[in-house]
């Protein structure tokens, strides 16, 4: 089942550390249970956002790649 995000954060063209900072700010705005889709093309974004999600104890729902773009879906759990 495909999860429809509540918000999408477009980080295409942004490089470290901007995708992580912007993801953190967006997660702070979400309500528990909502999902955030992050789109990025920085090669470091996937691992950086994964680390952020783990450190914030949120749920990494899925990670997908299409060409140079990574799509990361995060659910706020607390």
Predicted regions and their residues:
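Compositionally biased, disordered extreme N-termini, encompassing classical targeting presequences
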Residues: 1-6, 77-78
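Sterically constrained small-residue positions within well-ordered secondary structures
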Residues: 2, 14, 29, 63-65
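Amphipathic, hydrophobic secondary-structure cores in small proteins
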Residues: 17-61
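C-terminal structural segments of small proteins and small subunits
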Residues: 50-78
